[in-house]
Amino acid sequence: VLSVKISVSPVTPLVDQKLHQEDSKQFPYLCPMDFKRRRLAVTLRNQLNYPLQFNPFVFSKLFLLWVAVGIVGGVIASFYWTVLESLLHYLSQFQGFAVIPLMTVAGLLAGLIIHFLGDPGEMDLIVNNIRFKGGRLEPKNNPAMILSSWICIASGGSAGPEAPLVQVVGSTGTWIARKLRIKGEDLRSLSIAGMASAFTALFGAPLGGSLFALEIQHHKHISEYYQALMPALVASCSGYVVFILLTHIGIGPTWVFPIYSTPELNDFFYAMLYALAGTAAGWLFILTVRQSRSLFKKLRVPIYVKMTIGGLLIGTIAYFVPLSRYFSHDELNVLLEQQFTLKFLLILLGAKILAIAFTVTSGWRGGFIIPLFFVGATVGLVVNAAFPGQNLPLIMVSCMAAINACVTRTPISTTVLLATLTGFHHFIPILFASLTGFFLAPKTPLINAQLGIKE
C-alpha cells in the first residue's frame, strides 16, 4: 500500500514543482492524477487553518457578539419597561394633594436604596467612564440604579428611563466583554453598543439610538468613536426586535402630530426662526439646572435627605400643575389633543423646567431627553398661541429639535429621533432646527464630561 504524507504548510508554485520532481524520481509510477489530489488536499487543509480566508462573508465572530449584546439589551429593556408600566399604573391612582406625600416618601426610599447599595451615578459618569476608563461601565451599580429609578420615575419624577437603561445595558456589554477577555477599543465598542441598544428600545429608532450613543460622548465631534458605529447599529437592530416582540409596544410614531402640509422652500428659514425660541428655552433650562445643582451641593446632608427634599419640591409642583408630573411620554399627547390658553402654557413651561431641574439635581434617577422634548413642544405651542396662523407641526418639531440639540449637543441623532417619534418625515427642516440649537448653545455643555475633562 502506497502511503503519502501530507504537509500542512502553505504550498507555493515553486514548492509544487520541487515536490513533483522529487515524487517523479522516488515514485515513477505515481500518476499526475494522484499529484493533483495531493495538492488539492494540501490546499483544503490550508484553508481550514486560516478561517478568515475560508469565510467568504464580511461578518465574523464579533458580529455575532454585537447581536448577542443587542438581544440581551432588548430582554433587559423589556423587563425594565414591563415592571415600570405596572408601577406607573398603580401609583397613578395618587392624585391631588396625595401626590406631595407620595413623592416625598418616594424620594426618601430611593435615597435609602442609593445610600446602602451605592451611588450608580448619572449620565455625566457614564460619559466619563466611556471616555477616560476605556469604556468600562461598572455592573455592580445596577441594582441601585434599577430599584431607585423605578421608584423615582413611577412616582412622578420629571426624568425618563433612558439614563438608567443606558447604564444597565451598557454595563452589561462591559461585563460580556470582560468574560470573553476582550480589551481595548473592542471593549469600549461593546459598551457603546449596549448603550445604543437601550436608547433604541425606548425611542424605537435604531439609527437614531446608535448615533445618539456616539454623539452624547462629545460636545462637538460625533466621530470620536467612529469604530463603534457598526457595533451600535447591529446591537440596536437586534435589541429593538427583541423589545418589540416581548413588550408588544407596536411600531410607529410615539406622538401623533398634526399632518404637515407640503414643504416649501421658506420652511427651512422658518424652522431656524422657530428654533431660536427652542434654543432660548434650552439656555433657560441649563441655567436653571446649574443654579439648582449649586443649591443642592451646598446642603451637607446624606443623599436620602436631598432626595426627600427634591421629592417634596417636585410633588408640590405636580400638585399645582398636574401636567408637569411624570417624564411626559404620555403627557405630550395630551398637549397635542387638547387646547390650552397662552397663560396656562407659560405656567406649564416654567413648572416643567423647574420640575426637571429639581429631579436631576436632587439625586432622583432618570434621563431628561423625553422631558426636554415636552418642554420644546410646549414652547412651540406658546409661539403658536402668541402668533396664530403659523404652521403648528413645523413650530413644535423645530422647538423640540433645537432645545434637545442645545442641551445634549446631539444635532444629527436628534433629527433622526424626532423624525421617527413624531412621524414628521420631512427630514431637512428638523435638521436645520437641530443645527441652529447646536451652534447657538452655551460654550460649556451641561454634561461636563463632554468637554473631555477627566473627573
Where are these regions (language model features)?
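Short, low-complexity, charge-dense intrinsically disordered segments
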Residues: V1-V15, S24-K25
